[in-house]
Swiss-Prot record:
GO biological process, one term: leucyl-tRNA aminoacylation
Keyword Nucleotide-binding set for record: yes
Record localization: Cytoplasm
Molecular function per GO: aminoacyl-tRNA deacylase activity; ATP binding; leucine-tRNA ligase activity
Source species of the chain: Escherichia coli O17:K52:H18 (strain UMN026 / ExPEC)
Annotated positions binding ATP: K622
Name of the featured protein: Leucine--tRNA ligase
Length: 860
């Protein structure tokens, strides 16, 4: 064994061994308990970033630990390979998205191997290959036949720069999240999957997910947004149709003083024919922010349509306004307004001088003061005719019942959740497998024409999708008739909604899933990824699992038992102000810093002499140029050091502050472990440990070893507090470094301790542990070694620390046998110099003894 720890030499050797032995390849084995550990698959952007490294290190630690418990562990990896960035990069680099993507995959695969992650590479998949997306296309056609897919014209957020539809969440401050271009409203035909048909199940089954973070479950509950209310129909004077609204507060219905409709509503369109002001307003709304978060904060605007609706209970005429806060695609495109008891309605009514009628009393029973704001709390009705005096629940039911009896109301359950629009007007995605015949009939692509292959050898102009620009690509024949293929491609959330299941049978040729393999491995035991995926990916992931279950492919109701959302990785951020006032962000690697005595940054400059402004720690990002390249760190310190720092610096679900000083500390620790093993093995063979022949000091050290095993086992397995597990191993290492090594049993005990330390560190730092296990002559490869088991007998304390007080003041701390009697403890306490001093010449009036903990002598 060489004296110095040289990660650059050992890591590549160990990685080669894993590759050659196919150490982490697994097959179904009914005789073993399975464990499926999965991290969210990466987008092949070109290089790994520290966020990836953190996510995948957490997954690898858990997978390796579970393997050491003797389980059949599946830990696969693949590539979420379709998506818009590839198109931008292709245009920029004058290539096509496919070669750019495949080059990135090859590069990033090497980076993952360099970090020592124990993946089953035989299951690797890339979602951009026809072998993968053919089954997604086939599944879509099956969903169409089940009436779970439909096409409709829909108002969308359109980015004129990217020429694509954006989801509401992708609109930030009215602009495209990717390129910051102002978003427009546009009506286009799109394909939808009926996720709303599963709304109740998606909501109710959240209660089964005991090991998912409450924050994620709450976000999904709110996103699905189940509400109980009443749908009410209004007659409108001089208008051919009625207006239907939905309300969750029928108790306030007597205070409804106006209706509001979306700018795209047929009533508003009709009114605009003779109203230029309204026509201009409708035009303005076409280019308005539509993400819900924006709706809450934007200025509320409207125009009177001139139409009057009739209140079904009072018979009063109330105005109908077109308003920018009503969306056609939410509910009926019309809402009833109760300005006395809804703040948005109140602000709108105040702005345009509309009637505000209070119908709910304040909590103290007085009429509410509406001079400044609406009263939004529930309460007792007044000003409401026959319903006066009813509380919220009674009024809800009475008004709902009356409207139902009149034939103008119906109790309804509503959802905020909308059907999933899966059409994208981009090229680099899976083609949607639908065709249109010459007679206008729309139908699924026949099975014998699947997959509909996306051509990869294309020229990108950065504007139009190559399959839209090439009329020949769309031409096909179905049943002998000419037909045109759909030229939209799937939303890339489609591919990431079922990849976890395909990992169980990536080579399967007979269908989407091999049920036998899928049901052996599924559900996933732990799924690891960022909380930013809470409402999109993680909802579609659950939805797809239920679709596959209902197609008979899987037996379970949910795709993953546990979800672990890792925290972000933060780093220092610096900038200097350029000549034109712009901020130029400087990498923390290039910042020369001065620190105060507490280690805080007080001054910074770069190599060119610019005075830098330090903005603190923020999420590693390209925009702030504060990302740290994992590859540079691995080359400098080794993969094991980077992995150890990642797991030690912070709890897995909290933010992690990148500090190179912390990385250096992790590296020093591994050097100490190496040195201790080197010094131990240099002394030659070791005798067998004789537990019965140990001295008190040796027993105490062995007790520490086994207590550490127990703590680390609990921290990794049950608590998943990996940082405290590492801290416990470090504490034990400090004790081992000071332990005597001269006697035969000293060395035998050290051998037992080091074999335990190396196994406990193995999930975190597998390369050094693989090597040290061999040097310690551990049995076989450490990858097949069992996790150490704490010896209960070794952990039994045979002595305990008792605090000795005289008149309540601590005078000594003494070690006594655990079974010592009170008399023996008093006798031992009397031998202490300070205790004897305070007892000299006085009478002990009272003795308070808490066995094994405290002796208090009261003297007078």
């Amino acid at each position: 064994m060489q004296e110095q720890y040289r990660p650059e030499e050992i890591e590549s050797k160990v990685q080669l061994h894993w590759d050659e032995k196919r150490t982490f390849e697994v097959t179904e084995d009914e005789s073993k308990e399975k464990y499926y550990c999965l991290s969210m698959l990466p987008y092949p952007s070109g290089r790994l970033h520290m966020g990836h490294v953190r996510n995948y290190t957490i997954g690898d630690v858990i997978a390796r630990y579970q393997r050491m418990l003797g389980k059949n562990v599946l830990q696969p990896i693949g590539w979420d390979a379709f998506g818009l960035p590839a198109e931008g990069a292709a245009v920029k680099n004058n290539t096509a998205p496919a070669p750019w993507t495949y080059d990135n995959i090859a590069y990033m695969k090497n980076q993952l191997k360099m970090l020592g992650f124990g993946y089953d590479w035989s299951r690797e998949l890339a979602t951009c290959t026809p072998e993968y997306y053919r089954w997604e296309q086939k599944f879509f056609t099956e969903l169409y036949k089940k009436d779970l897919v439909y096409k409709k014209t829909s108002a969308v957020n359109w980015c004129p720069n990217d020429q694509t539809v954006l989801a509401n969440e992708q609109v930030i401050d009215g602009c495209c999240w990717r390129c910051d271009t102002k978003v427009e409203r546009k009506e286009i035909p799109q394909w939808f999957i009926k996720i709303t048909a599963y709304a109740d199940e998606l909501l109710n089954d959240l209660d089964k997910l005991d090991h998912w973070p409450d924050t994620v479950k709450t976000m999904q509950r709110n996103w699905i947004g189940r509400s109980e209310g009443v749908e009410i129909t209004f007659n409108v004077n001089d208008y051919d149709n009625t207006l239907t609204v939905y309300t969750t507060r029928p108790d306030t219905f007597m205070g409804c003083t106006y209706l509001a409709v979306a700018a795209g509503h047929p009533l508003a369109q009709k009114a605009a024919e003779n109203n230029p002001e309204l026509a201009a307003f409708i035009d303005e709304c076409r280019n308005t922010k539509v993400a819900e978060a924006e709706m809450a904060t934007m200025e509320k605007k409207g125009v009177d349509t001139g139409f009057k609706a009739v209140h079904p209970l009072t018979g009063e005429e109330i105005p109908v306004w077109a308003a920018n806060f009503v969306l056609m695609e939410y509910g009926t495109g019309a809402v009833m307004a109760v300005p006395g008891h809804d703040q948005r309605d109140y602000e709108f009514a105040s702005k345009y001088g509309l009637n505000i009628k209070p119908v709910i009393l304040a909590a103290d029973g007085s009429e509410p003061d509406l001079s400044q704001q609406a009263l939004t709390e529930k309460g007792v009705l007044f000003n409401s005719g026959e319903f006066n005096g009813l509380d919220h629940e009674a009024a809800f039911n009475a008004i709902a019942d009356k409207l139902t009896a009149m034939g103008v109301g119906e109790r309804k359950v509503n959802y905020r959740l909308r059907d999933w629009g899966v059409s994208r007007q981009r090229y680099w995605g899976a083609p949607i497998p639908m065709v249109t015949l010459e007679d206008g009939t729309v139908m699924p692509t026949p099975d014998d024409q699947l997959p509909v292959i996306l051509p990869e050898d294309v020229v990108m102009d950065g504007i139009t999708s190559p399959i839209k620009a090439d009329p020949e690509w769309a031409k096909t024949t179905v049943n002998g008739m000419p037909a045109l293929r759909e030229t939209d491609t799937f939303d890339t959330f489609m591919e990431s909604s079922w990849y976890y299941a395909r990992y169980t049978c990536p080579e399967y040729k007979e269908g989407m899933l091999d049920s036998k393999a899928a049901n052996y491995w599924l559900p996933v035991d732990i799924y690891i990824g960022g909380i930013e995926h809470a409402i999109m990916h993680l909802l579609y992931f659950r939805f797809f699992h239920k679709l596959m279950r209902d197609a008979g492919m899987v037996n379970s109701d949910e795709p993953a038992k546990q979800l672990l959302c890792q925290g972000m990785v933060l780093a220092d951020a610096f900038y200097y102000v350029g000549e034109n006032g712009e901020r130029n962000w400087v990498s923390p690697v290039d910042a020369i810093v001065e620190r105060d005595e507490k280690g805080r940054i007080v001054k910074a400059k770069d190599a060119a002499g610019h005075e830098l402004v330090y903005t603190g720690m923020s999420k590693m990002s390209k925009s702030k140029n504060n990302g740290i390249d994992p590859q540079v760190m691995v080359e400098r310190y080794g993969a094991d050091t980077v992995r150890l720092f990642m797991m030690f610096a912070s709890p897995a679900d909290m933010t992690l502050e990148w500090q190179e000083s912390g990385v250096e500390g992790a590296n020093r620790f591994l050097k100490r472990v190496w040195k201790l093993v080197y010094e131990h093995t240099a002394k030659g063979d070791v005798a067998a440990l004789n537990v019965d022949a140990l001295t008190e000091d040796q027993k105490a050290l062995r007790r520490d070893v086994h207590k550490t095993i127990a703590k680390v086992t609990d921290d990794i397995g049950r608590r998943q507090t990996f940082n405290t597990a590492i801290a416990a191993i470090m504490e034990l290492m400090n004790k081992l470094a000071k332990a005597p090594t001269d006697g035969e049993q000293d060395r035998a005990l050290m051998q037992e301790a080091l074999l335990a330390v190396v196994r406990m560190l193995n999930p975190f730092t597998p390369h050094i542990c693989f090597t040290l296990w061999q040097e310690l002559k551990g049995e076989g490869d450490i990858d097949n070694a069992p996790w150490p088991v704490a010896d209960e007998k070794a952990m039994v304390e045979d002595s305990t620390l008792v605090v000795v007080q005289v008149n309540g003041k601590v005078r000594a701390k003494i070690t006594v046998p655990v079974d010592a009697t009170e008399e023996q403890v008093r006798e031992r306490a009397g031998q202490e110099h300070l205790v004897a001093k305070y007892l000299d010449g006085v009478t002990v009036r009272k003795v308070i003894y808490v066995p094994g903990k405290l002796l208090n002598l009261v003297v007078g």
